[in-house]
């Protein structure tokens, strides 16, 4: 019974292979999850496609600029400190050299004195008003000025020395010390004012012109004498040729001996007459040359006598000196109204006082003296 029971059980429940089992069907939840995943993938693909398509213009990046907020520096008002020495405009030689220099050449000197380049209108005036540095030797400011001067070239230092009436010889360090020592306590050198070269050159030109004229006159006189001598030589040659031609003719036309004896005295007479004519021509030429030489010498002596006869006052006439000009300017300024009179009018009046001389070259001196007298 026990054996039959399992058999019966086997018959009742038929066995199936594992492969033949039916696949399990997915539930509703799993299907919904799959659909959501597919939708997400589609959205990602669409976004990628959109990113590839460029729509419109590209936005430019804005340039970020740095804005420096600089605080406006207020310049200190320009003041000229009173120094221990004399003002540069009061020293005659320095005032003279300042008037000769251009404003561009004085910029470095102005910067050295006042730590600023200065304007064109007030540059020379400010340099002239300088009377010395207010600080003492060996201070911090003194060292700064020394460093500033060391940066200048030798040519610039020498031009500053020229303006300040100092020696221009020496090395860079010597020039720097010389300039600083003077600027600490400016004082006059005691040398006289340099003479203007224009007046000297004018006189030398006149002398050269007069000597040149005399040389030209001598050269023109010499050819005249030579021409006279050459003309006399030509006359002599012509006479010689004529005599030689006559002699040839005589030799060709020789008659018989009898006639020759009779004609000989006639030929001698003709030759003698020709010789006398030659001598007369030579004497005339010599006399003409001597007469011309005498006339030229007479003219020269007359011109010398006429120059000697001139009064000595004419020979000794010279242009007015600086002192004379200064006195005339003083008189003109004393009689003139300074509020109405211009510099041009004063210059014209000075020229009128000396009409025989050309004083246009001394115009600068007249102007400087007027300014000195007014100040």
UniProtKB/Swiss-Prot annotation:
Q: What are this entry's molecular-function GO terms?
A: DNA binding; histone binding; RNA binding
Matching PROSITE patterns: DEK_C
> Which keywords annotate this record?
Acetylation, ADP-ribosylation, Chromatin regulator, Chromosomal rearrangement, DNA-binding, Nucleus, Phosphoprotein, Proto-oncogene
Q: Name one GO cellular component term.
A: nucleoplasm
Q: Where is the motif (Nuclear localization signal)?
A: 205-221
From the UniProt record, give one GO term of the biological process aspect.
signal transduction
Q: Where in the cell is it found?
A: Nucleus
Q: Where is this region: Disordered?
A: 1-61, 184-325
**Leader sequence residues:** none
Every SAP domain range: 149-183
| Bias kind Basic and acidic residues: ranges | 19-30, 48-61
Q: Which domain of life is it from?
A: Eukaryota
- Name the cystine pairs: none
Q: Where does this protein have compositionally biased stretches of type Low complexity? A: 278-296
Q: What's noted about post-translational modification?
A: Phosphorylated by CK2. Phosphorylation fluctuates during the cell cycle with a moderate peak during G(1) phase, and weakens the binding of DEK to DNA.
Task: Specify the DEK-C domain's residue ranges.
Answer: 319-375
For the modification ADP-ribosylserine, the affected residues are 279
Question: Which residues are recorded with the post-translational modification Phosphoserine?
Answer: 19, 32, 51, 72, 121-122, 159, 201, 204, 210, 227, 230-232, 243-244, 251, 287-288, 296, 301, 303, 306-307
- Locate the compositionally biased regions of type Acidic residues: 31-47, 243-253
UniProt modified residues of type N-acetylserine? 2
**DNA bind region:** 337-351, 367-371
Q: Where is the composition biased (Basic residues)?
A: 194-203, 258-277
Q: How does it assemble?
A: Found in a mRNA splicing-dependent exon junction complex (EJC) with DEK, RBM8A, RNPS1, SRRM1 and ALYREF/THOC4. Interacts with histones H2A, H2B, H3, H4, acetylated histone H4, non-phosphorylated DAXX and HDAC2. Component of the B-WICH complex, at least composed of SMARCA5/SNF2H, BAZ1B/WSTF, SF3B1, DEK, MYO1C, ERCC6, MYBBP1A and DDX21. Binds DNA.
Summary of the function given for this chain in its UniProt record? Involved in chromatin organization.
> Related disease?
A chromosomal aberration involving DEK is found in a subset of acute myeloid leukemia (AML); also known as acute non-lymphocytic leukemia. Translocation t(6;9)(p23;q34) with NUP214/CAN. It results in the formation of a DEK-NUP214 fusion gene.
The name this protein carries in UniProt is: Protein DEK
Please spell out the taxonomic lineage of the organism that makes this protein.
Answer: Eukaryota, Metazoa, Chordata, Craniata, Vertebrata
Q: Gene encoding this chain?
A: DEK
């Amino acid at each position: 019974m026990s054996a039959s029971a399992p058999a019966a059980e086997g018959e009742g429940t038929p066995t199936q292979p594992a492969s033949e089992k039916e696949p399990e069907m997915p539930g509703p939840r799993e299907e919904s999850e799959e659909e959501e995943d597919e939708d997400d993938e589609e959205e990602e693909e669409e976004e990628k496609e959109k990113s590839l398509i460029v729509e419109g213009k590209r936005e430019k990046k804005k340039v970020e600029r740095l804005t420096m907020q600089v605080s406006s520096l207020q310049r200190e008002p320009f003041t000229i400190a009173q120094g221990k020495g004399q003002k540069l405009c009061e020293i005659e030689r320095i005032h003279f050299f300042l008037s000769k220099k251009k404003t561009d050449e004085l910029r470095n000197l102005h910067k050295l004195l006042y730590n600023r380049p200065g304007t064109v209108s007030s540059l020379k005036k400010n340099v002239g008003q300088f009377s010395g540095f207010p600080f003492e030797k060996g201070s911090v400011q003194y060292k700064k000025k020394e460093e500033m001067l060391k940066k200048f070239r030798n040519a610039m230092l020498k031009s500053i020395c020229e303006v300040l009436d100092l020696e221009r010889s020496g090395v860079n360090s010597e020039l720097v010390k010389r300039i600083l020592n003077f600027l600490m306590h400016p004082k006059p050198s005691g040398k006289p004012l340099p003479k203007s070269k224009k007046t000297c050159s004018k006189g030398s030109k006149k002398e050269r012109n007069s000597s040149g004229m005399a040389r030209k006159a001598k050269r023109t006189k010499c050819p005249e004498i030579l021409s006279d001598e050459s003309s006399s030589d030509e006359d002599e040659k012509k006479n010689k040729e004529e005599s030689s031609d006559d002699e040839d003719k005589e030799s060709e036309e020789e008659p018989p001996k009898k006639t020759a004896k009779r004609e000989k005295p006639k030929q001698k007479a003709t030759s003698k007459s020709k010789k006398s004519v030659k001598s007369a021509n030579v004497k005339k030429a010599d006399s003409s040359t001597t007469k011309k030489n005498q006339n030229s010498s007479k003219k020269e002596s007359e011109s010398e006598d006429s120059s000697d006869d001139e009064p000595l006052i004419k020979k000794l006439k010279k242009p007015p000196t600086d002192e004379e000009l200064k006195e005339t300017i003083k008189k003109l300024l004393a009689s003139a109204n300074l509020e109405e009179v211009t510099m041009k009018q004063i210059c014209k009046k000075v020229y009128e006082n000396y009409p025989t001389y050309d004083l246009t070259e001394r115009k600068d001196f007249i102007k400087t003296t007027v300014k000195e007298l007014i100040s």
